[in-house]
Design a protein with these regions (language model features):
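Cytosolic-facing regulatory segments adjacent to core modules
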Residues: 4-92, 106, 206-208
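Short acidic/His/Gly/Ser-rich catalytic and metal-binding motifs that mark active-site loops
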Residues: 24-25, 103-107, 145-148
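Walker B catalytic acidic pair
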Residues: 100
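Catalytic cores of soluble, metal-dependent hydrolases
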Residues: 140
Length: 230
């Protein structure tokens, strides 16, 4: 998502990758851009055609304004300070992505109540989005209770330690892998649903996609049974 945004604008894109090292995230971006098997990338065993697409992907990535932050222990105020600086540089700030919300440190104000801590973080991100006039995409964990249900399709109440997340967010979307039989192997894209659970200014709906695991690519499904990369 951050990569797609970066390719379409000259504005700065801030990615706070609090779970995955930036190096690993960049490798996934190269895999997606060049449509190169991520297993080949991780081992360095690329074929001639792979190297060509690798260089093209590097060139595209180098032309974007993506800024990574992968250090742990970051607080909402630190995120805001970094984003404020990016907003004053170049063409300004176009998008903020945080992976994931529950890994952000809160103040000691609500020490002992994780739900209140997450609520404080959620409100701080909402305030930042309004002040800087920038969209903020914050990934969130789901509660383990979803695995105990027969119907595992996510609902709003499944947001882990949700607090005020569902109230603060303009849009809440969840990814869901339908329980269908699919051929085994990385070559076959897996069906996946993007479920819009909340849309403050629009309808909720479910969008059918395909996920190509070996290149970490989502594909939109065309009515004529084709597929195009997103």
């Amino acid at each position: 998502m951050g990569l797609a945004a970066a390719k379409s604008t000259k504005k700065n894109i801030a990615i706070f990758s609090l779970e995955m090292p930036a190096e690993q995230l960049i490798m996934r971006m190269i895999s997606s851009l060049g449509q190169i098997d991520n297993k080949k990338l991780s081992t360095g065993k690329l074929e001639n055609d792979d190297w060509k697409r690798f260089n093209e992907a590097i060139s595209i990535l180098a032309d974007t304004n993506i800024f990574f932050h992968d250090a742990g222990g970051v607080t909402p105020s630190e995120i805001k300070a970094k984003c404020r600086r990016l907003a004053t540089q170049g063409e300004g700030l176009g998008l903020v992505i945080i992976d994931y919300l529950q890994l952000i440190d809160s103040s000691s104000r609500y020490s002992g109540s994780r739900q209140q801590e997450v609520s404080e973080i959620s409100r701080a991100l909402k305030t930042m989005a309004l002040e800087l006039e920038v969209p903020v995409i914050a990934l969130s964990q789901l509660s383990r209770s979803v695995e105990k249900r027969e119907d595992k399709k996510p609902v709003l109440s499944d947001l882990r330690e949700s607090g005020s997340i569902e109230q603060d967010a303009d849009i809440v979307a969840a990814l869901h892998a339908p329980d269908v039989e699919v051929p085994v192997g990385d070559e076959v894209p897996n069906p996946i649903q993007l479920i819009i659970l909340k849309h403050r200014n629009g309808p909720t709906k479910t969008i059918d996609l395909l996920f190509k695991k070996k290149t970490s690519t989502f594909l939109s499904i065309r009515k004529e049974n084709g597929a195009s990369a997103n």
